[in-house]
Amino acid sequence: MENSHPPHHHHQQPPPQPGPSGERRNHHWRSYKLMIDPALKKGHHKLYRYDGQHFSLAMSSNRPVEIVEDPRVVGIWTKNKELELSVPKFKIDEFYVGPVPPKQVTFAKLNDNIRENFLRDMCKKYGEVEEVEILYNPKTKKHLGIAKVVFATVRGAKDAVQHLHSTSVMGNIIHVELDTKGETRMRFYELLVTGRYTPQTLPVGELDAVSPIVNETLQLSDALKRLKDGGLSAGCGSGSSSVTPNSGGTPFSQDTAYSSCRLDTPNSYGQGTPLTPRLGTPFSQDSSYSSRQPTPSYLFSQDPAVTFKARRHESKFTDAYNRRHEHHYVHNSPAVTAVAGATAAFRGSSDLPFGAVGGTGGSSGPPFKAQPQDSATFAHTPPPAQATPAPGFKSAFSPYQTPVAHFPPPPEEPTATAAFGARDSGEFRRAPAPPPLPPAEPLAKEKPGTPPGPPPPDTNSMELGGRPTFGWSPEPCDSPGTPTLESSPAGPEKPHDSLDSRIEMLLKEQRTKLLFLREPDSDTELQMEGSPISSSSSQLSPLAPFGTNSQPGFRGPTPPSSRPSSTGLEDISPTPLPDSDEDEELDLGLGPRPPPEPGPPDPAGLLSQTAEVALDLVGDRTPTSEKMDEGQQSSGEDMEISDDEMPSAPITSADCPKPMVVTPGAAAVAAPSVLAPTLPLPPPPGFPPLPPPPPPPPPQPGFPMPPPLPPPPPPPPPAHPAVTVPPPPLPAPPGVPPPPILPPLPPFPPGLFPVMQVDMSHVLGGQWGGMPMSFQMQTQVLSRLMTGQGACPYPPFMAAAAAAASAGLQFVNLPPYRGPFSLSNSGPGRGQHWPPLPKFDPSVPPPGYMPRQEDPHKATVDGVLLVVLKELKAIMKRDLNRKMVEVVAFRAFDEWWDKKERMAKASLTPVKSGEHKDEDRPKPKDRIASCLLESWGKGEGLGYEGLGLGIGLRGAIRLPSFKVKRKEPPDTTSSGDQKRLRPSTSVDEEDEESERERDRDMADTPCELAKRDPKGVGVRRRPARPLELDSGGEEDEKESLSASSSSSASSSSGSSTTSPSSSASDKEEEQESTEEEEEAEEEEEEEVPRSQLSSSSTSSTSDKDDDDDDSDDRDESENDDEDTALSEASEKDEGDSDEEETVSIVTSKAEATSSSESSESSEFESSSESSPSSSEDEEEVVAREEEEEEEEEEMVAEESMASAGPEDFEQDGEEAALAPGAPAVDSLGMEEEVDIETEAVAPEERPSMLDEPPLPVGVEEPADSREPPEEPGLSQEGAMLLSPEPPAKEVEARPPLSPERAPEHDLEVEPEPPMMLPLPLQPPLPPPRPPRPPSPPPEPETTDASHPSVPPEPLAEDHPPHTPGLCGSLAKSQSTETVPATPGGEPPLSGGSSGLSLSSPQVPGSPFSYPAPSPSLSSGGLPRTPGRDFSFTPTFSEPSGPLLLPVCPLPTGRRDERSGPLASPVLLETGLPLPLPLPLPLPLALPAVLRAQARAPTPLPPLLPAPLASCPPPMKRKPGRPRRSPPSMLSLDGPLVRPPAGAALGRELLLLPGQPQTPVFPSTHDPRTVTLDFRNAGIPAPPPPLPPQPPPPPPPPPVEPTKLPFKELDNQWPSEAIPPGPRGRDEVTEEYMELAKSRGPWRRPPKKRHEDLVPPAGSPELSPPQPLFRPRSEFEEMTILYDIWNGGIDEEDIRFLCVTYERLLQQDNGMDWLNDTLWVYHPSTSLSSAKKKKRDDGIREHVTGCARSEGFYTIDKKDKLRYLNSSRASTDEPPADTQGMSIPAQPHASTRAGSERRSEQRRLLSSFTGSCDSDLLKFNQLKFRKKKLKFCKSHIHDWGLFAMEPIAADEMVIEYVGQNIRQVIADMREKRYEDEGIGSSYMFRVDHDTIIDATKCGNFARFINHSCNPNCYAKVITVESQKKIVIYSKQHINVNEEITYDYKFPIEDVKIPCLCGSENCRGTLN
């Protein structure tokens, strides 16, 4: 400051202040100047001047500045530069502490033309992009194809990875993965910069270019993996643990830490925070590391899952501790030591000196690097401090980390005090693990498939320590038991599967099963390695969750919320899983382990175990380790996440058997081979479990699951050969030792639900996959599925699980697994329902659980396990092969049968079943992928059957691939095919299949259509039994094809436990099976006579076989068991078939619960394949016999058809053979049908029926008794039926019976006529199949019979559904195939199945053409699975329509037999209640009855009435034509109640169901004997229609009484007998249910004869039958039911729900849940909005129906788009109808001459007139004669205006019409338009203050485009003082030439590109 001061202006001076601050403070001075500085001027006080005016001291000498100016140079301030002060963000580098959010995505293999902007635009759609960086070679500046994109949100990163990975961008398939810390990218960068790889050869799949084999190494050692991840080669467990996140060594180190975290310690797990935190900073690393650990900080710090995942996302390797540990955490602290111990353990092997960590025991933070040698041991050596991380750890869940299962971690380590806390406390201290394997060695070993036995990290410490590599030790196995479910797939296995393979697996819907099967080969080694199986396994297991999430990113970090269920386990695990996929590929490079991430947090147990082992072994496998960590942490989450894995979670145990499954995470990866050698494997099932590893939960830091919930006991070491380290048994509730033998049950609910949530669409796949399902809906559906499956508590399932495990079955898909978890998980800690379960670390032992000690015999155990697994796999393979062979054989037989049937039905409607089969056959292979789902859907054991998830035990065991046919529902549905519905296919699949088949059959034959009820098919698995042989054969063939082609898939999906080799074996067996099948065919041929003699038995066998085929897929073992038992008794056999079918649908249901369940149990235990194989073999043998019988029947039917025509149809050959006398002998199948029906009718009725068969027509007495009115008619009908001579034609020809009579033919005397409610039920049943033409059924009908599938379908249409039993079972038992309905024979109608079929006659016009919605429908008698049944039971138009349609129940009959009550309830739900014209209570009761019926086999006299009630629905005969009115039958049945015509119809419907129940008739048992009346019934319709009232067709044409076995007669009469009425219907339903139940598997009903197919047009029964729609599958029903989660529920639905609830309460069926349920009113939530009407053509339909009264329709963009593509040069003339078109309605131009004259005149005028006059003239002329213009899509831009007539030069073309507005308004509008998104400007400036706005109103001139070389110009003319803009032609314009003019926009800075494309285009409009 200068001493001189300006003059002071005191007046301006502010009050003096001691200091500048004073005045400034008071006056807020902006500036001040020290005027006097005492230092310069002695003796002066400091003097400040403020703002040039005020002084600090008042001094006279002070003068303020007169002009205050800014002293700074002004120039620099003239321009304002915007300064962006961006909010600083944390830089997440190697020093970042805590879980790294997986927001960073690494792109690899990018096209070198991709630049930042392009990449940013590409990623923007997935979320806000914070940073985009493309890496270039620093020297050459060459594009490396690698890019980093940092998203603002984890979700955005995950979505980007999910949607962009493996997609083609600029011609390159790019690799996208979550690279949390960029380690993967740096690795790639190093690999590229070093020149080792080119951008396109970059080993992204392996994630670590260093060691593409890392996967293998991964399994062996985390350290190795880490090394690899770090870029080190597999062997590099180096000191440079985390030198560089990307460095080969470093990343691994981090990765190692990361992976090691997973492997041996929470620390490692913790990844972000120092690994050591466990000790000193338990929270920092441990908590983070072991999401399971209670310590939140630990969790938070290194939420292994979170951190891991996040890191992993960044860079799988780096993601893990690799980066963190090494870089900061591990080194950081002693805590790191602990963590490091863990981390180092796995990372050490690769990068850090895990030894340090391990050796330190968690005390030395630096040890990671310091003790490279320890890396191998690190895991095993529990870090000293490790033991102590504290419970606190657990609480700290990193948002990203996958929380450990929240169940109290089973105390794996004694140290681990708290479940997780203990673990943490244990500091992940692992009980001293077996000596660490050399990292490299373990890796190598693991790959080899020998358990390398990498030094098992302290199992305890590992498990406790944050899911270190538990894989090694059995103990970890124990803990990871649950994790196994999740983990096993998660870590190691997942790595194996690349994201692509995993996705592929998911797409194939084989998530759990397929993966399992797929991995068979790698099963010896850890599947995880490279094999998709491992991936599969992962998917199946924890991995699956990743698959489910299918987010390569971190599940935990990124999607904490992603996993609904994973509390703490955020999406980390799931994400990592996908990450693992993606990462795994990348991580492979980094280390084999990267995939581990996929392993959802193993419940700490298996995954941890495996992870530990794998990670330990592959110390370097950071991704794995990370995954493992996450997997462990988010083990539960993963489980949940693994929706893919839905079954996966359960699979864990089941998976266990599979190597991949067994090894949760790493175990799966390192799996048996790696684990076995070095790690002590969990003791084999027989061995006492090793000390459980630390509770799996601790390893899962993220698992928020309440600790109290003890994870299920860790799965015992899986017996699967593939699983080196079987998952330890799931930890039992705290204190409860996990069952050593049983594989851990994955928390079923959690896994299932969470998985379902995530993966539901996958699981549901084709069926539901497409449908939008809200989380709630998915949860509900899953829950329902689970419920259906009957989540068994672990213990119950344990036996099965153990068996399955030992058998090599995987519970992967088995709900049971889930079941147990659901119980324990759900119960205690599972805050969430099932989904959360996975969260809790199932593998985590209960809090008190003692961690397993490394088993010194682990290697031995592992070796043994491997051997056992191999053997199991071999067995499974053998079984699968046999099954496949059988499938092939049966398929061949089916083809042959179809061919024969087609030939037989040549005169009738063509049968497409054969074709369908052929079509289907190929499908099996495709289906293999969906096989899982199919099998799941079919798997009765599963609750998914309805869902079609194909996740059930059955699904797993079943070789869905065999049943892949399911995908060809048409096949099943096609009557022609007469295939029984393939149980193996998922319900939905079945539906599809049945629909397809039905469609084909419908095309071929209405009969077939009727038989094959698309819905029925979908709904009932076995209902198509009637086509059993055919179906079986075809199905088997298909199965075999699918099995052989996708044997692995089949194996995987079919039997989780099936070893990888299973596929091969399966194929081999398939060949064997084929041979067997061929032999079987021969046998069948030989047996034909035998079967004829005991057609019931044969029929049963055949049906059973078919059933088995279906059932095999769905529940092979169940079917096998049931079939085996049932095969002995034809009736029983039939019941079995039916039951099997039912079971397939209701496996988890009541019926299935017991016999089915036990079968399933044993099946699962025995190895899904072997037991199914056996069952299938047996079943197939039976099927073959049946088929042979059916063939014979077909032949006979052909003969009889030749002789009797329709009768032959009905008899299907067999009946023909039986002839009049046949009724008694009718074929056991028929008898069986009758039996069922009879049962439904009454016990006595059945006997009477049996006795009655011989009775002549006169024996109609009982019928009379039952229904006196029907007696006469019945007698006639019965006579016809009995009489061999009367053919179906006769029946058809017959005038409609009087109401009495009509019923009579139906009457097959059901004991309880009332039960047989003649309701539209019957019609509804038939409706699915289109009414058959009344034409006499061609002999080919017999063929139909042969093709069970076909008959059911035709039956559906023509034949009334079999009696309940028949429908459900009879179809099978009756063996429609065996007993082809004679075309003319009505008797078959009487026959249980035929009767049923007939009973539900299909009115010619009936919409009910029975496509055989249910198998019962399909075969006419085929029962439908309950869900399906109900589904398929449509409401009938008949008065009885309300009848619940036992039809549904019918199909359920079989189902019921299997599922018992469940089936019944389903029926009720779907079938009975739906139609519900019956009293609701009745339907409710019906379910009980159905249930009972389902349970009870044929002999359920008491229930008979109920089944009958249900039976009516099956009745498919058209009301107009009686199926068969076998008087004898009726008599046998007892007094027939003749309902009014309508009633009769209902009765028929009922009868059908009921008849099958009367097994008394031999025909019932003898399929051959059983002439399917369905056909005839359908045919009988032709006779003069009875009054609409009588449901039965007109007096049955001369039915073949003889042909109509009594059973058939019975079937018939019951429907007639059942009087229409609420009671009748109820009774009928009940009876039907009973019948179905008693009837067991239905015989394939013979294919419907043409007659049957086409009901007589005249039959009054046609009374407008309500359209019969394909019965909905259980899945569809569930979809509809749970659609409330999507669309809400309206008042009506709420009301009905309430009513149903009340009725159920009244019914009191012993449903405990009902008593525990309280109805609470809830407001409707329906948000449905009117659906937009779709217009197929451009012309809009007029709302008012009249164009003149219609207003103007605005044309929406969609409509316009239709024309955009059309060429501009459309016809010169406007379309005749311009209604929906945008062509201006302009008067047609006058003659061309006139036009030309006017144009010439205008030119002349313009030449001599002033411009104004000329313009005015032109304008006026234009007004009078508009030019013909049109707007079309323009090549210039969007729409354009085109001339429709030649326009001369200088002619006025059009006026630019719009609103005249002022500039101000124009400006406002322009802004508003922009806001509204109106991009184009239609404002035309007239002058400086006037603008014409044509935006909202105007004419076509607004469409004129700009051109730089226009053919028109705009001119402003004044008309009546108004300025107008007119477009004039500049030159001659031709027709279809576009009108253009120069917009002449003012020149502006912002240029608008010109698109005119003219030669002299300026390029811009302005």
From Swiss-Prot:
Residues 243-259, 265-274, 282-300 have a biased composition (Polar residues). Residues 432-441, 449-458, 592-603, 679-719, 1312-1340, 1501-1514, 1580-1600 have a biased composition (Pro residues). Gene3D superfamilies: 3.30.70.330, SET domain (2.170.270.10). Its EC number is 2.1.1.364. One of its GO terms (molecular function) is RNA binding. Residues 531-543, 1041-1064, 1148-1174, 1383-1425 have a biased composition (Low complexity). Residues 1-12, 1515-1524 have a biased composition (Basic residues). It is an enzyme of class 2 (transferase). Residues 1-26, 235-302, 357-660, 675-719, 963-1462, 1501-1541, 1555-1606, 1636-1668, 1767-1800 are annotated as: Disordered. It is found in: Nucleus; Nucleus speckle; Chromosome; Cytoplasm. Residues 637-646, 1067-1087, 1104-1142, 1175-1197, 1229-1238 have a biased composition (Acidic residues). This is Histone-lysine N-methyltransferase SETD1B.
